[in-house]
Amino acid sequence: MNRGALIKLVESRYVRTDLPEFRPGDTVRVSYKVKEGNRTRIQDFEGIVIRIRRNGFNTTFTVRKVSYGVGVERIFPLHSPLIQKIDIVQRGRARRAKLYFIRNLSDREIRRKLRADRKRIDKDRAAERAAKEEVQKAQEPEASQE
């Protein structure tokens, strides 16, 4: 077994598969575990994904938001156990892979450049409806057996 295969084998145990798929331009809410002193709490960070750096297990993504008129960017490791969950607030349609140019734009210009991606939103809603229907169908036979 060569070195690369061994590294992939070890890393595969820690890869997260429970997180949703997202792209640059999407607005996401990241729930991140923060340790303050002797207690831990969950902190939400909501903003636009401006970059995804794919590097296997070391994949990171950058989220940008404007808080009280100041732009804040945070880099999250995708496979970190400190990430509780990632919620996709809105799907965006970006024409670039790296959205560094939005650092210089106003909120109004950002909304115009990153329009909502209706096709991906509709696919997500259809998938959610199908999943709910499957759960309901699975529960109906159980109720009739009782």
Curated annotation (Swiss-Prot):
Keywords assigned by UniProt, alphabetized: Ribonucleoprotein, Ribosomal protein
Keyword Transmembrane on this protein? no
Q: Which GO terms describe its biological process?
A: translation
Q: Superkingdom, according to UniProt?
A: Bacteria
* Record carries keyword Ribosomal protein: yes
List, alphabetically, the GO terms of the cellular component aspect: cytosolic large ribosomal subunit
Q: Which family does it belong to?
A: Belongs to the bacterial ribosomal protein bL19 family.
The molecule here is called Large ribosomal subunit protein bL19
Q: Source species, please?
A: Thermus thermophilus (strain ATCC BAA-163 / DSM 7039 / HB27)
Taxonomy of the source species: Bacteria, Thermotogati, Deinococcota, Deinococci, Thermales
